[in-house]
Amino acid sequence: MEEIIKPVSKELLKAELTEDRRLRMTNKSNNQIYIITHQNAPNVMREIGRLREIAFRAAGGGTGLSMDIDEYDTMEHPYKQLIVWNPEAEEILGGYRYLLGTDVRFDEAGAPILATSHMFHFSDAFIKEYLPQTIELGRSFVTLEYQSTRAGSKGLFALDNLWDGLGALTVVMPNVKYFFGKVTMYPSYHRRGRDMILYFLKKHFNDREELVTPMEPLILETSDEELRTLFCKDTFKEDYKILNTEIRKLGYNIPPLVNAYMSLSPTMRMFGTAINYEFGDVEETGILIAVDEILEDKRIRHIQTFI
């Protein structure tokens, strides 16, 4: 494990967070959302790399390097970084990186050069019909001090703020119809709890078209029969009650991002789970969300407020 780099000077960060890179104000907390790249804001990128590595290590993942910056952040046509900036404290609350489907390059074999390409296989149907209208999201993080379990009300809105940013992207890029991303579970999470969550997601959100498939699908440790007996209800709501109760019995909670995605859209598609051996063996579940099928209250909150 390398020692994490020291914080980047606030003056250097502010110099790179220029008005032309500001996307919007957030609905809550009066924070600001910026979009940068490694090329136009190298100091902000270093600070993102530092904060990501701290957050992911604390959860049981991470690269083990002094900061989490990889070739997808730094390549010639890199992922863009969407960050939430607290102008009062002059610090980054959290962020995502993203790539527009129309900006995706392909390798010599015709496979898309995506941060998830080493874990998932993308069907021709996905590449032709979905990818050009998709934003791929990754490396979602909330800075440790702003995580709601630690920060109380200060952290409550960090994820909410991030989604204001994603909502704004769909407005400034109206051709975007889908978000493709991953839900991450950590090896430290209770194994039976993980199996229950993944079984529940598969039961209610399974993608039957096999648009995207894990190259090495994760095998659950709990028997299918046991999970089928447990989640025996007809509706998402009833099964969700069971899931929540059972996870709490284990002394755990459903991870916040898993909860958040499930409540975003009833038509979310789940593509199965792969182990990310390059990132602390975390378990990544691929998901696709259609922008126009995001539940109305969420759409009003994160998208309409920007129009």
Language-model features and meaning:
Residues A59, S66, P266-N276:
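Short, well-structured beta-strand/strand-turn elements
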